[in-house]
Amino acid sequence: MTAGGSPRGIADVDAIESERSRWYELIGLVRALSPEECLEPGYYRDPAWSVRDLLGHLGTWLAEAEIQLQQINAGTYEGHELDIDALNAEFLEAMRDQPWDVASVQAHAGRTRMLQEWHGLTEPDDEATWWIRKSGADHYDEHLDRLRTWVEELVGRR
């Protein structure tokens, strides 16, 4: 166990730190908006996404990572050969009609559970690091530039 409480080496501590810093940037941007602004379509245009849809999307990926990390820890993990586009469509549909509060709570809970599973791994490996990056820092990076622009646009309308 490292001084920071992580059972992993430096590369893995870096993965957690990257996840943390990007998550807090993302959430800081979201908190700059009113609940009504979070429901405004336009974050993406085709298909039309709101910030609620973005948080629902991120939250479902975090929840999926939690499941995969559980399987890694239990020795039942079968690899990450998956159809990302199909999962994105499935996750978007699952969260599409959820209220803002549900999408927000689900994203925060998904992240918390994913991190709990990460820290509970008895034998962390490259697959675990792949999931923490795919669902966390790397995934947030895919969305942060557009979110910054969209938040600036929404705030500018006030």
Describe the function of each predicted region:
Residues 13, 30, 51, 102-105, ...:
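Extended aliphatic helical segments
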Residues 22-29, 61, 110-113, 117, ...:
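Amphipathic, well-ordered alpha-helical segments in soluble domains
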